[in-house]
Amino acid sequence: MGGAPDLTNLRVRELLQLEASIVSELRGRGLVRTNNKPLGDIAEQVVLAARGGVLEPNSTKSHDVTDQSGRRIQVKAMGGRVVGRSGKFSRFRSFDFDTAVFLIFAAETFELVLAREVDADSVEAVAPYSRHTNGRQATLRQVESLGLDVTTEMREAFATLDPDAVDLVQ
C-alpha cells in the first residue's frame, strides 16, 4: 500500500466514524488518554518512552511527564497540517515545569521532523502573553532554534511505540 487509503469517496459520517475508530484503537493500545485529537497524547508517550518516569494524570497542572530524575516536562506537539514556521503551539497557562519538549510532525506523513527541548524561562521569554486567552503561545519560529535539538532521541522513542506494526508506506 502506498500511503494512506483513499478517503475521497467516504461520506462525512463515515470519516467521523473512521476517526472515532482510530482514536479507539489508539486508546486500546494505551497511547492516548482522551477522545481529543490524538497527536498530543502520542507526543506525551514519545517523551515518556524517551525519558522514562511517570505520565502525569490529565488533571496535572503545567506538566505532562515527570522523568526519572524528577524533572517536570511539558510536552507540546504540532503537525498534521501545513502551517509553516508561523504555526502556533497550544497555550502555556503556567510555567511550573522545568523544560518543554516541542515535537513537530510532518503534515500527512506524521514523520517526526524536529524536536526541541527548551527550559521554562526561555519559553516564557519568547512566547507573547494574550490577556484574551490568559496564556502565552509560542510559534515554531520562536522555538526552532532555542534549547537543545533532541530530534534523534525522540525519533528513536517514537519508533518504539509500535514495534510489531507493519510499515504500509513503501
Each model region followed by its residue ranges:
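Nucleic-acid endonuclease domains
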Residues: M1-Q170
